[in-house]
Amino acid sequence: MIIYHLVPKRFYEQQIKNAVYLPKPFAHDGFIHCTKRADEMARVANQFYKQERGPHVYLYIDTRRVKAKIQYDDAARQYPHIYGGLNHDAIVAIRLAQRDPYGDFLPPEKLEIRD
């Protein structure tokens, strides 16, 4: 299954050299925030990151490849959390997050994963 994570492009590019990816809020939250659905990713992005300027990227994460524990902390199971660093080989695609003329994030494009 593919899950989604949004990150400022510049910050992600700085993380590539590290053994695992850790977003800025990880030190405080203890996990990496993700969403299960593309439309939900856009909703969350607009709720929390709309005011952030600069380019952002969507990370497409294959849950079968993630080495850290993944846990759903909500009853609806829409928000998977990765409890640990994200190994880079679990990121199967990176796409520039697009915005509409009003600055709202658009959902990430669907991605077909073949085994």
Model-inferred region functions:
Residues 1-115:
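Conserved, structured core segments of small domains
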